[in-house]
């Protein structure tokens, strides 16, 4: 009779059960952490792409008003001044001769996003996209090297 009462008082987890749970958590963490880090870098790349948007519109207006790309430089012909001070993931945005170069900062320090305008007022403007850096795969698929209107 006393034996059954002792067995009912034993509650909790054994050391083996706790070690198995810890091992499972460790395995899941080794899979999840690299995926999360890659995801955050991809989100940061979108900041590089967004930084070029206002300059892209300015360069197009410049091309339509001057009929060439060579005079489309930051701070001239209606184009916003270049950004030379780092802010967030963007180190700088430089516009020169119709080209827009966005350099990354922080975890994206080795990355560059380059847009080059070609065309004139009659033909319109086309953009060639170039992505540089060791993590260029973080840019959207079929994005780098594309030509868009």
Swiss-Prot record:
Signal peptide: none
Keyword rRNA-binding among UniProt keywords: no
Alphabetized UniProt keyword annotations: Fimbrium, Membrane, Methylation, Transmembrane, Transmembrane helix
GO-annotated cellular components: membrane; type IV pilus
Places the protein is found: Fimbrium; Membrane
Modified positions (N-methylphenylalanine) in chain numbering: 13
Record GO biological process: type IV pilus-dependent motility
InterPro entries: N_methyl_site, Pilin-like, T4P/T2SS_Core
Membrane topology (UniProt): Single-pass membrane protein
TM region positions: 10-30
Residue span(s) of the pro-peptide: 1-12
Pfam families named in the record: N_methyl
Family: Belongs to the N-Me-Phe pilin family.
Protein name per Swiss-Prot or TrEMBL: Prepilin peptidase-dependent protein D homolog
Annotated organism of origin: Haemophilus influenzae (strain ATCC 51907 / DSM 11121 / KW20 / Rd)
């Amino acid at each position: 009779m006393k034996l059954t009462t002792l067995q009912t008082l034993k509650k909790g987890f054994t050391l083996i059960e706790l070690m198995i749970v810890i091992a499972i958590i460790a395995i899941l963490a080794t899979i999840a952490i690299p995926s999360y880090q890659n995801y955050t870098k991809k989100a940061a790349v979108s900041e590089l792409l967004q930084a070029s948007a206002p300059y892209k519109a300015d360069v197009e207006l410049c091309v339509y008003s001057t009929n060439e790309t060579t005079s489309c430089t930051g701070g001239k012909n209606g184009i916003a001044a270049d950004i030379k001070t780092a802010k967030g993931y963007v180190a700088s945005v430089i516009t020169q001769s119709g080209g827009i170069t966005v350099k990354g900062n922080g975890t994206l320090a080795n990355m560059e996003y380059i847009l080059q305008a070609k065309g004139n007022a009659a033909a319109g403007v086309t953009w060639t996209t170039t992505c540089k850096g060791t993590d260029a795969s973080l840019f959207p698929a079929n994005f780098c090297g594309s030509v868009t209107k």
